Amino acid sequence: MSVKEHHSTVGAIAEAVAEAAHGDLPGTKGHHPISAVIGTAITGGRQNAGTKGYLTAYLKQLETNPLRTKMLTAGTLAGSQELLASWLAKDRNKNGNYFTARVPKMATYGALVSAPLGHFLIWILQKMFQNRKSLRAKILQILVSNLIVAPIQNSVYLVAMAIIAGAKTWKQVQATVRVGFWKVMKVSWLSSPLCLAFAQKFLPEAAWMPFFNLVSFFIGTYINYITKKKRLAALRRKHFGDGAHGDHRHDRERERDRERERHSSPPHGHGPSHGGRPINPTLGSHHGGGPVPPPQDYPSLGQNPRY
């Protein structure tokens, strides 16, 4: 940068700060001019001054590039949901990290499957009831959403979750859908009418899908967290044979091992010895005057406990 350009930039910044100090910058009162200038610069510039910069920019992207924006939103939320649920449930991978292999898979599902499908279905739903604002039309829209749109989305979701979980055959996928379908539908039927009624009342149609994704993020994180906790508890029961208190069982096993070692070790000064030290009974006594082999500090305890 040349000296002339440097002075020009400094002058522009000083002028912007002075403008903000007098409250001339839209949305500012002059109390914190430097913060106002910085905040305006990073939230869209002067043309967006006085508006909610990030939200305005996001809604603008929803209008100009709806599918791309929804794909990025759904992918980010799905990956974040898996990561947050893993952290809450203390579900780590073999390297001890919460960023498991499911995180990028869930992000891919959200961006490439969930978002395009939801975009298409919500578009059809909105087209069916376009320019129909009566209470009857709104109730009918909620019914169509719950009886047609939700079953399609939930079925695709369960198929994707089965594949991500490692299902290899169509029968395994069918079993996953059969077991989980009505459970997921019950959650949808409880939350969807409220969310759709809220969207009908307060949100522009372009913002419906991101709003539904945000609600699904919180509900999905909770369900994912509960599922992970149950799976970890089942693994502990299988591994330790003692419900969710596997760590305590591990401690009790070690304590019993130490007690067994103390009772099994021959006391010093008793039994056959050489030089006041107990002789390893498996080696017998030594009459040849050679060095005494080291004692066996930990006698055999049979099979190791299951850890």
Curated annotation (Swiss-Prot):
Changing R102Q: Shows a slight defect in association with hex-1 assemblies. Pfam families: Mpv17_PMP22. Residues 241-307 are annotated as: Disordered. It comes from the Eukaryota. Disruption phenotype: Impairs the recruitment of hex-1 assemblies to the matrix face of the peroxisome membrane, and the subsequent production of Woronin bodies. InterPro entries: Mpv17_PMP22 (IPR007248). It is found in: Peroxisome membrane; Cell septum. It is a multi-pass membrane protein. Changing R102W: Leads to total defect in the production of asymmetrical nascent Woronin bodies and localizes uniformly in the peroxisome membrane. Keywords: Membrane, Peroxisome, Transmembrane, Transmembrane helix. The chain crosses the membrane at residues 106-125, 146-167, 207-227. GO terms for cellular component: cell septum; cytoplasm; peroxisomal membrane; Woronin body. Residues 241-264 have a biased composition (Basic and acidic residues). Residues 266-278 have a biased composition (Low complexity). Woronin sorting complex protein involved in both Woronin bodies (WB) formation and inherence. Localizes to large peroxisome membranes where it self-assembles into detergent-resistant oligomers that envelop hex-1 assemblies, producing asymmetrical nascent WBs. These structures are then delivered to the cell cortex, which permits partitioning of the nascent WB and WB inheritance. Self-assembles into detergent-resistant oligomers and forms a complex with hex-1 assemblies. Belongs to the peroxisomal membrane protein PXMP2/4 family. This is Woronin sorting complex protein. It comes from Neurospora crassa (strain ATCC 24698 / 74-OR23-1A / CBS 708.71 / DSM 1257 / FGSC 987).
